[in-house]
UniProtKB/Swiss-Prot annotation:
Disulphide-bridged cysteine pairs: C4-C11
Family: Belongs to the somatotropin/prolactin family.
Reported tissue expression: Placental basal zone cells.
Primary location: secreted
Keyword Glycoprotein: yes
Post-translational modifications reported in the UniProt record: Glycosylated.
A GO molecular-function descriptor: hormone activity
Listed name of the protein: Growth hormone-related protein 4
Gene Ontology terms: cellular component: extracellular region
Keyword terms: Disulfide bond, Glycoprotein, Hormone, Secreted
Highest taxon above the source species: Eukaryota
Localization annotation: Secreted
Amino acid sequence: IPACMVEDGGCWDPLGEAFNSATQRAETLRNL
């Protein structure tokens, strides 16, 4: 499985998406 799979929206990076999700979740908890 390639680290970067090309989709209609361009390039999707599973690890990058997971990292962004974790970052956003941490920011949300911090803002509570």
